[in-house]
């Protein structure tokens, strides 16, 4: 490996999450020493708005860390030891389309689940591969990419197919946010929990929640039956997951467990198991993308503007599990700590009755050479079947991306549990292709050339 202090590059430096991640790094400098932090983004204007806030966060803790802001990949990645990836291809403008187009057809509109997640995946796979190639060209030969880019399951499958030897660890903060809520309910820090979990990203179940060796899932079941996966005071949840739409999401754990009480579901399973209720309560004219643009994004940009003029930085960003988790994982990679975390890995028999090469989300011990997954064994038929259908949809979408195949994209949309019929799938996909004409040239051409018969 390599020795600290490290050079860290953040790809997607203009993200509203960047200040919180950097703050998490700053409070852990003894655990993860840094020589330099580099922000890299193809949107220079957005990154230049965020960068002064990030520099202020750094300077509040260290005068010696070098800080670089660039849109040049050679400058960004040369000699880097770690790259944190958090790209959002199309930004919130396209997320809004991902959410609103399905809703026009009475189907769940969500960033990473359903047709919206599939569309987002079609935009993100190839740019992620391009990023991997840039890191491979310029960074340290043993550099690790820790990837937060959504939709994580589809991105991870695309990377597995196209760059199977890349040193990329795909992670998601959703299970960790759920663990934070569990810890708050049980009165312990989330790091005191040891969980067993299986599934795909945004599509899995907690099977045990241990505190000092004792399974607390029975206690959590009783609490969830009253309050969902929230403390009695919902304000005590993670600040990044505590606005009204998230409170509803945490409460929806209750009806799922009322029907299927054995395991505790990932919150995103609400979109697959109760889609009609979700659609009934979604506003087709004002979705989560609008909430974020008018909330977190506007607040941070206003704070950046105020800081530019006054030198005062308001409390405009969250330091929560999102930043904490990626730093935990990076520490374990850097120092071979073998910490146990929930991450995405190639299955290789961890879940016995899923395909060997599937990308699954399970506990793993994080070493300097990557994750060593914990064996789950057989999962019940109900869960296996749900997982196989979701996996097939994601794998077909990756094939559609690689081949520029309209038919495989349509198959992927049709297989997704949130989409009721082939007709819905086709109508949504066709509208998505038009909205994404700047991002899906191969698919656009296949559609226009009539690869399959259009109505």
Model-derived features with residue positions:
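Rossmann-fold NAD(P)-binding glycine/threonine-rich loop
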Residues: 89, 93-162
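Internal, well-ordered domain-core segments that constitute the primary functional module
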Residues: 131-214
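Short acidic low-complexity segments
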Residues: 66-79
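Conserved glycine-rich cofactor-binding loop
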Residues: 14
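Redox-cofactor binding/interface segments in oxidoreductases and associated redox assembly factors
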Residues: 78, 84-85, 147
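Glycine-rich phosphate-binding loop and adjoining beta1-alpha1-beta2 segment
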Residues: 27-62
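Long, compositionally biased stretches enriched for glycine and/or charged residues
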Residues: 187-455
